[in-house]
Amino acid sequence: DDAAADVIADGLVAGGLPVLEVALRNPHGMAAIERIAARGDVLVGAGTVLDREQLRQALDVGAAFVVAPGLDEEIVEAALTAGVPVLPGVMTPSDIQRGIRLGLERLKLFPAGAAGGLALVNALAPVFPGVRFMPSGGVSTANLGEYLAHPAVFAASGSWIAAPARIAAGAEAVAEAAREAVAVRAKAGMGAGR
């Protein structure tokens, strides 16, 4: 709802991490993207994009990027045609090769934790040296630093920063978790540019 969107966005901005993927599996996802995009101080994208219609709707309400759980060529091609960054989910070498054929160099590794976590990144990175990954699924404060320290990782995605208990506690609770993630990123030697 609007109040939760405001708490999350306010907390991320205050915590120095003004980037948010809103999962469209939430019935309020499109409205949240529209509300947060209108603020202008948060880079907001649509997550769990499953088809071209969701992609179109997300772009219409202001999504600056799209993330999909899998590699769907139609979604990737439509996003690239629209000039919007797209991060499709991959888990296997075949998925990664399909992404490379579509011109992608950055891919969401999903579900990272269930698929082997850092061991999977270690196995895939030397085979695909031109690809950078965003682990998602099973990422937490416990393993965030290990992921971000890996040169094949450009970002990580997780819901712990905006967990329901933090949202209920307010923007400062979200900001505290965001600050912790920013500190982990810095400790891992990852600047904002990677």
Regions inferred by a protein language model and the residue ranges of each:
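Conserved N-terminal beta1-alpha1 strand-loop-helix module at the mouth
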Residues: 1-64, 81, 130, 141-142, ...
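Glycine-rich beta-to-alpha transition loops that act as phosphate-gripper elements at the mouths
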Residues: 1-2, 26, 46-52, 68-72, ...
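Catalytic cores of alpha/beta
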Residues: 51-61, 94-102, 119, 125, ...
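Histidine/lysine/aspartate-rich catalytic loop segments that bind and position anionic ligands
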Residues: 65, 69-115
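Glycine-rich phosphate-binding active-site loops on the catalytic face of alpha/beta enzymes
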Residues: 65-75, 108-118, 140, 144, ...
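CoA-thioester-processing core
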Residues: 79, 86, 118-128
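A contiguous pocket-lining binding segment that forms or flanks enzyme active sites
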Residues: 103-108, 120, 127-130
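Short, well-ordered alpha-helical segments in soluble proteins
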Residues: 111, 125-128, 157-160, 182-185, ...
